[in-house]
Design a protein with these regions (language model features):
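Active-site-adjacent structural elements in enzyme catalytic cores
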Residues: 1-200
């Protein structure tokens, strides 16, 4: 099912439909400031397992989307230096790797207690997380075509994944450049993958 949500004024009624789907262990596809992404509630172990299977790479790391930095600090260890980096660069097209706190369920973690965190500069993505009241587990929607790595058209995404997810949010054409990944678990920030933005 394709649900149209406009970024400049997200409809509360449509956001409620998205939240209800997520609270029923559903997976949704939603727009971000980089590429379209799968999302499910951090609280739903069942949905996290389904998301891993849907991606076909069960051991690949998943990322957690937050509404703001205060929410990040509830789930990750954030010292003053890390806080300053996050404040300068978020919201934005970054994935920061941080040490997870005990509030992050084991199902959402890999072998080490590190998670990727995102605060997208996209009003729909942040409105969904805020309305849900908890972070979302997320993973990029990849394209099977090796030339076009990320699918940007929500209608094509719905055709491809509509049967596998509860709904697809149509927030307009997406981007096809992924996030910049920065590891903040060491003494100095380390760029793991160059992406859409430069670290400030």
């Amino acid at each position: 099912m394709l649900v149209k949500i406009y970024g400049d004024n997200p409809s509360e009624r449509e956001l409620k439909r998205v939240v209800e789907a997520l609270e029923r262990d559903g997976i949704v596809i939603y727009p971000t400031d980089s590429v379209y992404a799968f999302g499910c509630s951090l609280r739903s172990a069942k949905a996290v397992e389904r998301l891993r299977r849907l991606r076909g790479r069960s051991e690949a790391p998943l990322t957690v989307v937050f509404h703001d930095i205060a929410q990040v600090a509830e789930y990750c260890r954030v010292d003053n230096a890390v806080f300053r980096i996050l404040k300068r660069n978020l919201p934005g097209p970054f994935t920061f790797l941080l040490p997870a706190s005990s509030r992050v369920p084991d199902k959402a973690l890999e072998r080490r207690r590190t998670i990727g965190i995102r605060i997208p500069a996209h009003p729909v993505a942040r409105a969904v997380v805020e309305a849900l009241g908890c972070p979302m587990i997320t993973a990029s929607v990849k394209d099977d075509d090796e030339v076009v790595e990320y699918t940007t058209d929500p209608e094509l995404i719905e055709e491809r994944y509509g049967r596998d997810v509860s709904l697809v949010i149509d927030g307009g054409m997406g981007d096809n450049v992924p996030t910049t990944i920065v590891d903040l678990t060491g003494d100095e920030p380390e760029i793991v993958r160059e992406g859409r933005a430069e670290l400030q």
